[in-house]
């Protein structure tokens, strides 16, 4: 049986997905995410990380673990928190420029593990 992803691994997958979508992500206590493109007033889709097929690797993680991983990325400057009262997270424009080559290799292995769970 495969081990659940660590909070940092989960956050890395989310960050990678956000880069591909060019998206902002909202986290609430139920781990629902709203992705937005272009404008805060035009939502693209809602999905739940626990049930969405392509995020199956995250199914055993609790909301707190995901948020811990996201907060780790905020603290390291990979994601900007742009609202305090509601945890709206915006991928920083320079986030991927700041990730080291070793981190990118780790991303690739994490994403490989994620795809095996599809």
Segments and roles (model prediction):
Residues 1-118:
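Accessory DNA-binding and partner-docking regions appended to nucleic-acid-acting proteins
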């Amino acid at each position: 049986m495969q081990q659940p992803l660590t909070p940092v691994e989960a956050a890395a997958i989310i960050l990678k997905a956000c880069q591909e979508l060019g998206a902002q992500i909202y986290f609430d206590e139920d781990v629902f995410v709203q992705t937005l493109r272009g404008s805060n007033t035009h939502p693209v889709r809602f999905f739940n990380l626990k049930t969405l097929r392509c995020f199956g690797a995250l199914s055993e993680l609790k909301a707190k673990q995901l948020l811990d991983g996201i907060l780790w990325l905020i603290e390291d400057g990979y994601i900007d928190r742009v609202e305090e009262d509601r945890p709206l997270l915006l991928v920083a424009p320079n986030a991927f420029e700041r990730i080291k080559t070793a981190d990118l290799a780790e991303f690739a292995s994490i994403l490989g593990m994620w795809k095996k769970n599809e």
